[in-house]
Amino acid sequence: MTRSVLWRRLSGLDSRFFAHMEEIDYCWRLQLEGYRVCCIPQSVVYHLGGGTLPKSSPWKLKLNFRNSLLLLENNLARTFVAQGERPRKALRHADRVIFWRKCLDGCSAAVYLLSGRRDYFKAVLEAHREARSLVSRPDVEALARQGKTSGIAGRYGGSIILASLLKGKRVFDYIESKMVL
């Protein structure tokens, strides 16, 4: 549930996300505005996984790659400002994180190509092309007006890839123990 006044103020779900990660973006934006996002553990949610698109769909893969880039572009610099970084530094910091994320996506695309999954390879390339056309970069002045918030709960500040591959950590247990709550 969300307060209708907040829903209207933040313009609800961002329509650019279609079918994947739009609720994550909304919750992230709520936190950037200084609100808490909570859950009720006793609640039950019925969700048909793969109800929109089958798990093996190249379109689903494209949406996942594209929308995760949009999520970072929309919220990462603002998050760094909320944590106390100066706006220009926050933009550079976000750019670095997103650059490395794109490099890792390129590695994924290469693996798909080398393993004969040309449809997945194309999906990753299309995701990046579409993300570029959908992104509206935050400007320094807007970031400067934002101010600090108490932080973003549930954000992991490290690399899950390094934690998993290089340190041999079980990813979700490790992340849960390191998350900023």
Regions found by a protein language model. Give the residues of each.
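Catalytic-site signature of metal-activated, phosphate-bearing donor transferases
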Residues: M1-T2, I24, L104, S108-Y112, ...
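General helical secondary-structure elements
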Residues: D25, K62, A163-L166
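Residue-level signal for alpha-helical context at structural boundaries
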Residues: D25, R86-P87, A142, Q146
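Active-site-adjacent helix/loop segment of glycosyltransferases
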Residues: L32, R36-V140
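Membrane-interface aromatic/basic loop that binds lipid-linked glycans or pyrophosphate carriers
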Residues: V124-L181
